Every structure is written in C-alpha cells, then in structure tokens.
C-alpha cells in the first residue's frame, strides 16, 4: 500500500506528485493513456505560455472577477513561484513583449522530460494504461492491459480533468464511477468568437492580427488573434 495514489498524469497530477514526493511520501501516479502529460504537450505546440512576468496585483487583472476561488491558489503559487519552479528543472525562460513567459525551447517536451525524470529519481511509481472503473473505500479498481487490478492507498488524490479533449485523455468518464461528486456542467472555457462575416473578408481567412488590444466591459486583453471562416480566435481572446 502506498501513501498516496494520484489518478491523472496531467499537470495537476504531476505537480501533486512533485510536491508530495518532496515530503518523502510514497507515491503511485497512474494515467489511462500510454504516456503522461499528453494535453500538456499539445499546449506546448503553440509556445507554452507558462505565466506572466508582471507585478502580482496587475497579474490578477488577467482573471475574471467571477473566479474568486482562484485567488488563494494564485497567491500560494505566484508567477515568480512558477518561474522558480520551472528553472529548478533546468529549463531556461524568456519574457515576451507582452510580458508572457515561455521556455526558450518554445515547447513543452523538454520541461515534461525533466519533470518526469525528477519524479523517477524521487521514487514515484508511474503506471500507464490504467483506466479507473470503481472506488471502494480507499481502494480503486482499474482496467489494465492484463485485466483488472486493485490499488489501495492511505489517501487518493483525483486529478482527472474535465471533458475538453477525449483523444488526449480528458474524457470525464470518472463521473460514471464517482456519482456522489457534485460538479458544474462542463462547458468550454477556451473558445473563439463567432462572427458572420461579409463576403469581402474571405480572402483574410487564416491571417493573424498582431499586437492588438481587445476589450469586453472592464476586461482588457493584449495579444493577437486569427481571422477564421467562423469568426476570430487566438490568445488575445
């Protein structure tokens, strides 16, 4: 029996394993996919914006007033803390013109490799292709390549994500075997803006618009967008 069983090998699960293994707990980290951090790697294809290099009070303006539950998390792991943590993995960073912080490699794979390597050195047990199907007290039953397997732990930490990308592991099937967990209905949080363009915009589909400012009420964002057939999308939104 391990001290902590962590279910989900995305950034939340990896960070939990990173923190708890530093405190010398025995950790088993499982994921239903063949490898961990798949959506994290996909995020890195666009450069992997990790945080913003700006005063903390200004940084908070990047978040909606409707998300006060984020405040304590942001205070406990500030942009400076994020940068210190990344550099502790041997990853070099740079700050872009809008204050966004990126790894110099402009991708996630070097960071993920260093992260997993540190977990391995601390003795974290990593298991793949482990699909959780039922919970019984402090034991979790999994479907594996070799049949069903039960793992018991003193504590179980769920870091299974939402329903954003089934192909990369975020399928929200945990709702079926955790029926007593209350959750809000899943909805997209990173979306474009639909616009019914007039015909003369056709020739601009796929074109970026850079170094702009967008406003919605009191909220302002600086960045860039891309004109698409159905509207606009990109980091600025």
Language-model-derived ranges and their functions:
Residues 2-29:
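N-terminal Rossmann-like FAD-binding beta1-loop-alpha1 element of flavoenzymes
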């Amino acid at each position: 029996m391990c001290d902590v069983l962590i279910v989900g090998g995305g950034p939340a699960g990896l960070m939990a394993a990173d923190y708890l293994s530093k405190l010398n707990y025995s950790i088993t980290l499982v994921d239903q996919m063949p490898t961990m951090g798949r959506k994290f790697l996909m995020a890195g294809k666009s450069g992997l914006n990790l945080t913003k290099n700006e005063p903390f009070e200004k940084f908070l303006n990047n978040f909606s007033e409707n998300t006060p539950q984020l405040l304590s998390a942001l205070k406990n792991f500030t942009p400076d803390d994020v940068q210190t943590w990344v550099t502790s993995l041997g990853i070099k960073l740079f700050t872009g013109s809008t204050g966004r912080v990126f790894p110099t490699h402009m991708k996630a794979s070097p960071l993920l490799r260093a992260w997993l390597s540190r977990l391995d050195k601390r003795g974290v047990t990593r298991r793949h292709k482990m699909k959780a199907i039922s919970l019984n007290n402090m034991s979790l039953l999994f479907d594996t390549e070799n049949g069903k397997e039960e793992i018991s732990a003193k504590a179980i930490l769920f870091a299974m994500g939402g329903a954003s990308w089934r192909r990369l592991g975020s399928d929200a099937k945990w709702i079926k075997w955790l029926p007593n967990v209350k959750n809000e209905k899943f909805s997209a949080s990173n979306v474009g803006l639909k616009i019914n363009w007039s015909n003369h915009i056709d020739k601009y589909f796929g074109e970026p618009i850079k170094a702009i400012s967008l406003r919605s009420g009191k909220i302002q964002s600086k960045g860039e967008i891309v004109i698409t057939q159905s509207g606009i999308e990109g980091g600025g939104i």
